[in-house]
Amino acid sequence: MYLLSPRNGDEEDEQEEIQELISDDEPPNLKLASCATAASSSSSSGSDMEKGRGKACGGGSTAPPPPPPSSSGKSGGGGGSNIREAAASGGGGGVWGKYFSVESLLLLVCVTASLVILPLVLPPLPPPPSMLMLVPVAMLVLLLALAFMPTTTSSSSSAGGGGGGGRNGATTGHAPYL
C-alpha cells in the first residue's frame, strides 16, 4: 500500500533531518545501521542528493554496504505473482501440469469412479433395441461432419473471382462445399 499512497515531500524531509541528527550522535557501528535506513528511505526520492542531504552516511567508513532487503515475506503484493509465473512457465508438473488443471483431474476421477461403481450397484438390464444403438453412431457422424466443415464463408466480391468461391474456389477452381 505504500506505493499506492500519496507522498508528502515535507514529511520525508523532516524524517531525513531527524535521521541525520540521530546518525550524528550515534557511535560508529550504530551509525552504519542508521545509514542503511537513511539510504533506503532516501532512495525513493532522487532529489535528496540534489539538495545535499545524502551526505549523512558519506564518512570514510570501509565497511561494505549492507545487502538489499530480501523480497521474501516483505513484499506486499508481489509474492504471489512470482509463484504464479513459476507455475505458468512449466517449472513443475511436466505434461500433467501443462494440459490438465486440478478441476479437470477431479472431474476425471469422479467420472471414472461413477463408471466403476454404477454397474456394481444397478441391477442387470436387458440389452437395448438395435435401433437405439444407432443414436451414438449418428452423433459421432454428425460431430465428424461438423469438424471438417469450413469455418468462414466469403462474399461474392472476394479475390478468387466472383461467385463466392471461398478457399476452394480461389485455389482449386471447384465449387464451394454448400
Curated annotation (Swiss-Prot):
Q: Tell me the segments the record calls region Organ Size Related (OSR) domain.
A: 100-151
What is this protein called in UniProt? Protein AUXIN-REGULATED GENE INVOLVED IN ORGAN SIZE
Which BP terms in the Gene Ontology apply to this protein? cellular response to auxin stimulus; cellular response to cytokinin stimulus; positive regulation of cell growth; positive regulation of cell population proliferation; positive regulation of organ growth
* Domain comment quoted from the record: The OSR domain is sufficient to promote organ growth.
Protein purpose: Promotes both cell expansion and proliferation-dependent organ growth.
Induced by what? Answer: By auxin (e.g. NAA) and cytokinin (e.g. 6-benzylaminopurine (6-BA)).
Keywords (alphabetical) are: Cytoplasm, Developmental protein, Endoplasmic reticulum, Membrane, Nucleus, Transmembrane, Transmembrane helix
**Where, per UniProt, does this protein localize?**
Membrane; Nucleus; Cytoplasm; Endoplasmic reticulum
Q: Where is the composition biased (Gly residues)?
A: 159-168
* Acidic residues: compositionally biased ranges: 10-27
Signal peptide location in the record?
none
Low complexity composition bias: which ranges? 33-47, 169-178
Q: How does it sit in the membrane?
A: Multi-pass membrane protein
| Family (UniProt) | Belongs to the plant organ size related (OSR) protein family.
Tissues/organs with expression: Mostly expressed in young tissues such as young roots, young leaves, and seeds. Also present in stems, mature leaves, and spikelets.
Transmembrane segments annotated in the record for this chain: 105-125, 131-151
Disordered: annotated span:
1-85, 153-178
